[in-house]
Amino acid sequence: MQMSEPLSQKNALYTAMNRFLGAVNNMDQTVMVPSLLRDVPLDQEKEQQKLTNDPGSYLREAEADMYSYYSQLKSIRNNIEWGVIRSEDQRRKKDTSASEPVRTEEESDMDLEQLLQFHLKGLHGVLSQLTSQANNLTNRYKQEIGISGWGQ
């Protein structure tokens, strides 16, 4: 990164990760009885996503209920905080290294910055969507148990 970039741009990914982690932690603290989320449909969320044409909506439509949504968000939070299992990473590296074409060092260096920018933009977008999901789940839980105006 260049030194002339504003501080907000330098920490954009860090800020997005913190927003997501904060939203999931808030969700985790609010949802005192996660089993109440079982069999609660995502219909309200689906209607909202159809109106906004959200790029991640197809993932949420595949989920059966709010409990699976809750579990998924907590799992993603744990992966961000603690990392993924190393044995899976090593196995994937072995599988992909055999199929990767051989590149020269110059080609690799030129592509690295573009590749990093592509993935950072994607990661930032995904983190924003996940933060929104965690906040929506928290609000929906409050509605379901009748405390929708509390804590706001």
Swiss-Prot record:
Concerning Pfam families, the annotation shows:
Spot_14
- Name a single GO biological process: regulation of lipid biosynthetic process
Q: Where in the cell is it found?
A: Nucleus; Cytoplasm; Cytoplasm, Cytoskeleton
Give the UniProt tissue specificity note: Expressed for a short period in the cells that will produce the enveloping layer (EVL).
Q: What's the superkingdom here?
A: Eukaryota
Q: List the keywords (alphabetical).
A: Cytoplasm, Cytoskeleton, Microtubule, Nucleus
What PANTHER family has UniProt attached to this entry? MID1-INTERACTING PROTEIN 1-B-RELATED, SPOT14 FAMILY MEMBER
Entry's family note:
Belongs to the SPOT14 family.
Q: What does this protein do?
A: Involved in stabilization of microtubules. May play a role in the regulation of lipogenesis.
Q: What is this protein called?
A: Mid1-interacting protein 1A
Q: Which organism is it from?
A: Danio rerio
Q: Top-down, what is the taxonomic lineage of the species of origin?
A: Eukaryota, Metazoa, Chordata, Craniata, Vertebrata
